[in-house]
UniProtKB/Swiss-Prot annotation:
Localization in the cell: Secreted
GO MF entries: toxin activity
Free-text note on domains in this protein's UniProt record: The cysteine framework is IX (C-C-C-C-C-C).
Annotated protein name in UniProt: Turripeptide IX-03
Disulfide bond positions: 48-70, 55-74, 60-81
Domain of life, source organism: Eukaryota
Protein's organism: Gemmula speciosa
Primary location recorded for the protein, binned into one broad class: secreted
Tissue specificity note: Expressed by the venom duct.
Keyword Disulfide bond: yes
Signal peptide bounds: 1-21
Pro-peptide positions on chain: 22-39
Cellular component annotations (GO), alphabetically ordered: extracellular region
């Protein structure tokens, strides 16, 4: 039993030593938004034109190719660009 514990710890330490961190400047860091259970990269939009262009592209109109980028742009459009 002790052998397996030692083996597990050794494997964990080995895997942690192989992880390389890449530096991220503040501009890139602020472009990432925390969403849901983890971090997803979501573009931030400064105006409705860019968000609408992304939301209304053909890949976002197809249920099979709709992805997180489509969701982020369409959520921005709904929240900020559509007036009643």
């Amino acid at each position: 039993m002790g052998f397996y514990m030692l083996l597990t710890v050794a494997l964990l330490l080995t895997s942690l030593m192989n992880v390389e961190a890449t530096p991220v400047d503040q501009a890139e860091r602020s472009a990432l938004e925390k969403s849901g259970l983890g971090n997803r990269i979501q573009p931030r939009y400064d105006n409705c034109g860019d968000a609408e262009a992304d939301c209304y592209q053909s890949k976002c109109m197809d249920e099979e190719t709709y992805d997180e980028e489509c969701e982020a742009s369409c959520n921005y459009v709904v929240a900020n660009c559509i007036s009643d």
